[in-house]
């Protein structure tokens, strides 16, 4: 995952995925993800770990604290790919929805929230809907609405509270 030619990297990732999870493969990838100075190499390690089902909850929690917004955003996308991640990761994602300075990360959260269970997504959507700095973003308000829309049937009163307190134009 450190080769300069991306073709070799993608080919190696595919081979690793075909082989499946092996701790001897995951350990060097974890080291790259947590400590490599180049964000693109950390992303490649993240993708490879995900491909071999080696992205554990503790490792993902560390990746959600990465200094690079792309690593944080991709971690969110990969974690929510198949539904709800662990409760501790949901808490971390909710904290990022409230406090992350990056619009890219908040956009990834809004997009991923659509794949969360309705009860899990409401607090996340509520935090996103209150971000005044995203009101003029061309994507975040719509993605937030799409995520909220799926939760309305589960808890109409809570959804109404969230939507009435949003910082965006009327959703």
Predicted regions and their residues:
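Long, ordered, helix-rich scaffold segments
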Residues: 1-171
């Amino acid at each position: 995952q450190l080769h300069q030619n991306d073709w070799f990297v993608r080919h190696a990732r595919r081979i690793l995925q075909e082989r499946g999870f092996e701790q001897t493969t995951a350990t060097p990838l974890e080291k790259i993800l947590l400590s490599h100075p180049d964000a693109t190499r950390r992303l490649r390690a993240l993708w490879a770990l995900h491909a071999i089902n080696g992205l554990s909850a503790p490792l993902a929690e560390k990746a959600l604290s990465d200094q690079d917004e792309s690593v944080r955003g991709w971690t969110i996308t990969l974690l929510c790919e198949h539904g709800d991640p662990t409760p501790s990761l949901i808490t971390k994602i909710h904290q990022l929805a409230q406090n992350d300075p990056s619009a890219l990360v908040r956009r990834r959260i809004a997009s991923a929230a659509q794949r969360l269970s309705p009860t899990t997504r409401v607090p996340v959507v509520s935090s996103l809907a209150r971000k005044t700095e995203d009101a003029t973003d061309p994507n975040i308000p719509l993605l937030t609405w799409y995520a909220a829309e799926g939760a309305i049937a589960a808890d109409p009163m809570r959804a109404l509270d969230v939507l009435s307190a949003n910082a965006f134009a009327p959703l």
